[in-house]
């Protein structure tokens, strides 16, 4: 349809241009015949016609350029975009586990907050407190420091109660006289009484003492070579010869000569 309308507009402009040509030729003929008044009126009308035609053509070309620049059909954004709250029909096991764990963590945190608000009563039994201690130790890591007593001396640390939401001071039962709150605190205090962990001292094994054995002193006697050659079953006479000095042997040898 747009091409057909442009073709019709082009035909009308062409016809108007031809008519203006014929009009100019007629005005020139009248000017030759000295008809000035008629020529002036005709020129003014021709000028008005040309101006209007130029304005019309300019508007047509501007409209055609804008129509070519703009797309004919705008894309719909709602068809391409998905809704934000869209839930997939397939509910996988991983999603179920993640939601289940998140629900458990929120319920445990709510229970711990309820425990902190019950700072003075503690009407629930001890089994529930122990179960909550175990759950809190398995899920929520705590980074709280032990409370400081007003006297300035800190109680010994109990390594089992690091993850508790609140630690209670030890209250002796002798001070409670008819107070239910004090008796409950006394019972919990007895359960939570700070017990010092046994200190393990590593004793070093004593080194074995090394005693030096006394060495036997051996006395070496000088003996002559003649005494070594004599047999063992000799009588006392040869033993005297063994113990005799070498000077005695030299004297005997001289007498024999």
UniProtKB/Swiss-Prot annotation:
InterPro entries per record: G_prot
Disulphides: 173-186, 176-182
Start and end residues of each stretch annotated as Disordered: 70-92, 118-166, 204-257
Positions of region (Binding to host heparan sulfate): 187-198
Domain of life: Viruses
Annotated site, Cleavage, chain positions: 65-66
Segment forming the signal sequence: none
Ranges in the topological domain labelled Extracellular: 67-257
Polar residues composition-biased segments: 73-90, 150-166, 231-243
Glycosylation sites: 72, 80, 85, 87, 92, 105, 139, 163, 199, 215, 233, 251, 253
Transmembrane stretches, start-end: 38-66
Keywords: Disulfide bond, Glycoprotein, Host cell membrane, Host membrane, Host-virus interaction, Membrane, Secreted, Transmembrane, Transmembrane helix, Viral attachment to host cell, Viral immunoevasion, Virion, Virus entry into host cell
Topology feature Cytoplasmic, residues: 1-37
Alphabetized Pfam families for the sequence: Glycoprotein_G
Keyword Membrane attached: yes
Gene Ontology biological-process annotations: symbiont entry into host cell; virion attachment to host cell
GO CC annotations on file: extracellular region; host cell plasma membrane; membrane; virion membrane
Similarity comment text for this entry: Belongs to the pneumoviruses glycoprotein G family.
Protein's UniProt name: Major surface glycoprotein G
């Amino acid at each position: 349809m747009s091409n057909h309308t442009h073709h019709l507009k082009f035909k009308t402009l062409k016809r108007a241009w031809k008519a203006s040509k014929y009009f100019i030729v007629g005005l020139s003929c009248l000017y030759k015949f000295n008809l000035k008044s008629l020529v002036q009126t005709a020129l003014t009308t021709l000028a008005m016609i040309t101006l209007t035609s130029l304005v019309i053509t300019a508007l047509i070309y501007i409209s055609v350029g804008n129509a070519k620049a703009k797309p004919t059909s705008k894309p719909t954004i709602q068809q391409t975009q998905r809704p934000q709250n869209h839930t997939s029909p397939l509910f996988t096991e991983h999603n179920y586990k993640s939601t289940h764990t998140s629900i458990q963590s929120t319920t445990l945190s709510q229970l711990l907050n309820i425990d902190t608000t019950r700072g003075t009563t503690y009407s629930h039994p001890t089994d529930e407190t122990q179960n909550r201690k175990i759950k809190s130790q398995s899920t929520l890591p705590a980074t709280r420091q032990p409370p400081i007593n007003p006297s300035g001396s800190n109680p010994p640390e109990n390594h089992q109660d690091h993850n508790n939401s609140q630690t209670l001071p030890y209250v002796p039962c002798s001070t409670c006289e008819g107070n239910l709150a004090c008796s409950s605190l006394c019972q919990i205090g007895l359960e939570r009484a700070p017990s010092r962990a046994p200190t393990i001292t590593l004793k070093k094994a004593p080194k074995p003492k090394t005693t030096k054995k006394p060495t036997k002193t051996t006395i070496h006697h000088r003996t002559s070579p003649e005494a070594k050659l004599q047999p063992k079953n000799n009588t006392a006479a040869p033993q005297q010869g063994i113990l005799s000095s070498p000077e005695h042997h030299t004297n005997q040898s001289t007498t024999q000569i």
